[in-house]
């Protein structure tokens, strides 16, 4: 393809990834790729690889496969199915609004997963072959974190390092305080309250990370707390009345024995129930699409924790997924770079 024909803009949506199937072998392949990323596990490389291949990949895949089986749908992995809908709806919205690039050409929307399929390398090759020379990357991690956002950038950079002709690159690294994002979160919470009534507490559960990462300079914790603060402010602006302890922030999905960001979600739910809280709603602002960590860990596992500790009503508020206001948010995020 001649360089004169390379005059197109493409948007690349990225998320973490998923096994191809809820089987032990598929989960083992996925975990091997995911847990081999030095951004994800920051301990001496040789030691970790020995632990990973000698212990974890022998034990964890079968257990995880059983959990994936519990959330698998006819469309396959919920995360992948939702991500594909996000891609299609964003493409439809850009076309409908006639949002073109600076050359007046239509913008194409693509999808890649950091681990698993569709891979970053495969998707970017397709974009390259389509003549895209202005690349806008939107990792769907609202709060920047090195293990997620920076790892997504690593994958982009690794792929581009093999190319001779590089595109212009715009990488949207965080949107934790974006007005459209906060408004979309509020709308999903308000819709639940309108349908089911006000709970006694609203728990905002974010994905956790080792506390060490915070001390090393990762802003993730601060970004999560800012998201919570802005959601509270939005709720107050919209006239919701609640006590100062109504919204609680916690962190889930801890792995290993190291100290992670606290308070932990399961411990928090147990404590709230033991204190007499009977009705709770839980939202997970760090997840742009429902996945194992929301559909199984929160909606099933942590529901049991709360009910077992004396709670009576546990409501999980779905991720923003392919909600219309979430798609508009994505469009507004990428629009300045088209």
UniProtKB/Swiss-Prot annotation:
It holds the Pfam family Ferrochelatase. Keywords: Cytoplasm, Heme biosynthesis, Iron, Lyase, Metal-binding, Porphyrin biosynthesis. Its EC number is 4.98.1.1. Gene3D superfamilies: 3.40.50.1400. GO terms for biological process: heme biosynthetic process. InterPro entries: Ferrochelatase (IPR001015), Ferrochelatase_AS (IPR019772), Ferrochelatase_C (IPR033644), Ferrochelatase_N (IPR033659). Its main location: cytoplasm. This is Ferrochelatase. It comes from Shewanella denitrificans (strain OS217 / ATCC BAA-1090 / DSM 15013). The lineage of its organism: Bacteria, Pseudomonadati, Pseudomonadota, Gammaproteobacteria, Alteromonadales. The gene is hemH.
